[in-house]
């Protein structure tokens, strides 16, 4: 299912480092027109400009994509590597460690099968509800934003005029009661992010009829198909500890950002890029365990700055 929809030039540079930038550029769209902030009457308040110009890192600054396509591309390429093994559908249940190894016990409900793996280091990239993160500790730094949004991903049919007339850029409706973000992902896909109010009946709001009544301001039901409708609680938090007993966190396991800057997945990929060379150096006896600990010292200030900025952008909405 689609989740993230945006990455930046630094992430494309990381994709280039693993020889995937050319493939990924073919399934992505450059964000040339930025984000338009409008009032309740669609008057433009501000434009955060986009561009197709190549930036300092050798790539355009903003890219939009369909996450299932990107995940398939990454997985297909990873499976070509001799040292890559995947076990899909397993959930971590217990983590143990000694001075030399980490042991991970997982279970697949669909296969009704237990799996135990032993490793030198375990990297927990298991998302916002991370069991690995809980193992390391629950202390967080909270920057205060906690808001519910309904995220709607639609596949649209461009044969209809109401779809053709949609803007080819992202629009932020700065409504003080119910902010709405309309994202232009590609010619075939659009996203709406709608704030849920305390007075809303969430079960009613999630019904198909209610969703289409809301979307009717912009599109007709016959011209689009809802691929996903999901309630999210947007948070602005970062774990205080990312490392314990040979277990390391990366991505949403370590931090959660509101999506208002499109930097959530970017932060996770930066984490992995900062961690990968350290793990390789350690495995080749060129780095010490202290160099792995320094991973958090490198990433924490950068991630926390972006989370705080995203929370501030949320206030503008």
Model-derived features: where do they sit?
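Conserved FAD-binding catalytic core of PHBH/FMO-like flavoproteins
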Residues: 36, 76, 121-234
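A conserved short coil-to-beta-strand element within the FAD-binding core of flavoproteins
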Residues: 88-103, 230-232
């Amino acid at each position: 299912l689609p989740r993230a929809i945006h990455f930046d030039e630094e992430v494309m540079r990381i994709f280039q480092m693993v020889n995937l930038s050319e493939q990924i550029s073919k399934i992505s769209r450059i964000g040339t027109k930025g984000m338009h902030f409008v009032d309740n009457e669609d008057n433009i308040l501000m434009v955060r400009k986009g561009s197709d110009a190549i930036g300092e890192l050798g790539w355009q600054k903003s890219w939009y994509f369909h996450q299932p396509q990107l995940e398939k591309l990454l997985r297909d390429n990873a499976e070509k590597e001799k040292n890559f093994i995947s076990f899909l559908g397993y959930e971590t249940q217990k983590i143990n460690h000694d001075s030399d190894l980490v042991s991970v016990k997982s279970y697949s409900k669909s296969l009704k099968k237990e799996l135990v793996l032993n490793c030198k280091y375990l990297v927990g990239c298991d998302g916002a509800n991370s069991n690995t993160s809980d193992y390391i500790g629950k202390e967080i730094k909270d920057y205060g934003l906690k808001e519910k949004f309904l995220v709607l991903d639609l596949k649209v049919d461009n044969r209809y005029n109401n779809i053709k007339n949609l803007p080819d850029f992202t629009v932020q409706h700065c409504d003080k009661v119910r902010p709405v973000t309309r994202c232009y992902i590609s010619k075939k896909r659009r996203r709406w992010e709608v704030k849920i109010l305390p007075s809303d009946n969430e079960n009613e709001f999630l019904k198909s009829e209610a969703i289409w009544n809301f979307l009717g301001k912009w599109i007709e039901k016959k011209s689009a198909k809802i691929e996903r409708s999901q309630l999210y609680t947007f948070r602005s938090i970062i774990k205080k500890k990312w490392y314990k007993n040979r277990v390391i966190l990366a991505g949403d396991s370590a931090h959660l950002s509101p999506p208002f800057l499109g930097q959530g997945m970017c932060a996770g990929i930066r984490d992995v890029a900062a961690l990968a060379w350290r793990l390789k150096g350690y495995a080749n006896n060129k780095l010490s365990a202290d160099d792995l600990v320094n991973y958090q010292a490198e990433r924490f200030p950068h991630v926390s700055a972006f989370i705080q900025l995203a929370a501030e952008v949320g206030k503008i909405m």
